[in-house]
Curated annotation (Swiss-Prot):
It comes from Methanocaldococcus jannaschii (strain ATCC 43067 / DSM 2661 / JAL-1 / JCM 10045 / NBRC 100440) (Methanococcus jannaschii). It comes from the Archaea. Disulfide bonds: none annotated. It is an enzyme of class 3 (hydrolase). One of its GO terms (molecular function) is alpha-amylase activity. It catalyses: Endohydrolysis of (1->4)-alpha-D-glucosidic linkages in polysaccharides containing three or more (1->4)-alpha-linked D-glucose units. The keyword ATP-binding does not apply. The active site is at E145 (nucleophile). SUPFAM superfamilies: Glycoside hydrolase/deacetylase. Belongs to the glycosyl hydrolase 57 family. This is Putative alpha-amylase. Gene3D superfamilies: 3.20.110.20. Its EC number is 3.2.1.1. InterPro entries: GH57_Enzymes, Glyco_hydro/deAcase_b/a-brl, Glyco_hydro_57_N.
Length: 467
């Protein structure tokens, strides 16, 4: 039995609750840099740094293997707020025991757009980041929050990926097990997350009312060993360690002893995801229509976490409208040297978290949404996001209108200057006398001004006529 441990590493650029009207740039107006720095460094100290250091030890001592999907917006914040975190991830990749899984740079919902160009653009941006920061070329792709359908799988396959990750949910499997490799109708290999075994760590580890509490490394290894199939893919938020479950819960001790306990079961082997793809053959086909798109979010495991209510859908449609407007006016914005700044902000606004905060689901799902949100209520999140969208749109339109106004003024000023110059020329001709001096070879043209001075203008060969 092959085992993979996979972790999502992501931090969004959280937006200001109120637009900063004193901001000199779009970033200062819309992005809460202070809050982002506070959150990033808090999570770095509680999760990223201790977990990375521990996994480096586990690799060194037990040849442990893990896989990460690291978003571009996370890397941007690491570079700005805490480069030691990024250095640790680089060290992990250099061990050769860590595989990076590709995803969307901005952790966006572009895969749900009508056209695929922005989705592909976000993936290619992410690929470029992996190459520049880590010197790594990813072979396996996972979409934002494991959002998946046949179309998404085909796009990933066309981009050259060997396999794609998604949720091993019953509605796509029926009676089948998630513990095998599958393929899409287009032949893209599919890795399925075992959500029960993943959530045992990710959500239930510190739940004292859980009938399996406390979860120990030896107990979990026994569960893995007794699970039938060919591969178990464990996938969770990296902040599981130290942030969602604090150090005091014993989560780090669990992770420290997990490789030791797994090694006690000879038929278990911890591998990287590309090894699974290379060593196993697909056991069947998974068909997921666009209208039945799945994800790993909430109990429904569909896209309702981001598009489940009217507020979210209004926000999503407005965002797409602004994107179309920016593209239609891209050449004008480039001439104004404003396109890059505007397009980057548009990309930041695409991050799925902005719509996730607007969910109004109940019970356990709502508590998870609230946990991640920096807004008091989903309605505050909606009002703030829509306010930024409309302000952003107004800024672009005002910029273009001012440019057109200035252009028209320059045209009018140019016309007035032309007319003025024309009048001066006419006056000049009236107040001057033209004298022609000829010799055998050339004729010289002189203009005699009002003071009687002769100014030679040019010479011309024969045939010159003055009317």
């Amino acid at each position: 039995m092959l085992i993979t441990f996979n972790f999502e590493v992501h931090q969004p650029h959280r937006l200001n609750k109120e637009i900063n009207q004193n901001g000199n740039t779009l970033w200062e107006k819309y992005v809460d840099t202070k809050l982002n720095k506070e959150v990033f460094n808090k999570v770095a100290n509680k999760c990223y740094i201790p977990t990375n250091e521990l996994i480096l030890e586990l690799i060194d001592e037990y040849d442990f293997k893990v896989n990460y999907s690291i978003t571009g917006v996370f890397v941007e914040q690491a570079l700005e707020f805490n480069d030691y975190v990024l250095d640790l991830f680089k060290d992990l990749v250099k061990t050769g025991n860590v595989e990076l899984i590709a995803e969307t740079y901005h952790h966006s919902l572009t895969s749900l757009f009508e056209t695929e160009d922005e989705f592909i653009e976000d993936i290619e941006m992410h690929r470029k980041m992996y190459k520049e920061i880590f010197g790594f070329k990813a072979k396996v792709f996972r979409n934002t929050e494991l959002i998946y359908n046949n179309r998404i799988a085909k796009i990933a396959k066309d981009l050259g990926f060997k396999a794609i990750f998604t949720e091993g949910i019953e509605k796509i499997l029926g009676w089948r097990s998630p513990n095998y490799l599958y393929q899409s109708p287009d032949g893209m290999k599919i890795l399925l997350r075992n959500y029960r075994l993943s959530d045992d760590i990710g959500f239930r580890f510190s739940a004292r009312d859980w009938d399996q509490y406390p979860l120990t490394a030896d107990k979990y290894a026994i569960w893995l060993a007794s699970t039938p199939g060919e591969v178990i893919n464990i996938y969770m938020d990296y902040e599981t360690f130290g942030e969602h479950h604090w150090k005091e819960t014993g989560i780090f001790e669990f992770l420290r002893y997990l490789p030791i306990e797994i090694a006690k079961h000879e038929h278990l082997e911890v591998v990287n995801v590309s090894e699974v793809v290379d060593r196993l053959e697909p056991r069947g086909e998974i068909y997921v229509h666009e209208f039945a798109t799945i994800s790993w979010a909430d109990t429904e495991r569909d896209v309702s976490a981001w598009l489940g209510n009217k507020m979210q859908r209004i926000s999503f449609e407005k965002l797409k409208d602004i994107g179309k407007f920016i593209k239609e006016n891209s050449n004008k914005l480039k001439k104004l040297n404003k396109f890059d700044e505007i397009y980057k902000m548009y990309k930041v606004l695409q991050t799925s978290d902005n719509l996730y905060y607007q969910s109004i689901k109940g019970l356990s799902d709502m508590s998870v949404h609230n946990y991640f949100s920096h807004f008091d209520t989903p309605f505050d999140a909606y009002a703030s996001y829509l306010n930024i969208l409309y302000d952003f749109e107004y800024y672009i339109k005002e910029l273009l209108a001012k440019s057109e106004f200035d252009k028209n003024n320059r045209r009018k000023d140019g016309q007035k200057q032309y007319e003025k110059d024309d009048e001066v020329k006419k006056e000049s001709l009236i107040n001057t006398n033209i004298i022609v001096a000829k010799d055998d070879k050339t004729e010289s043209i002189y203009i005699e001004d009002e003071e009687g001075k002769k100014n030679k203008r040019y010479e011309r060969d024969e045939g010159f006529i003055i009317a």
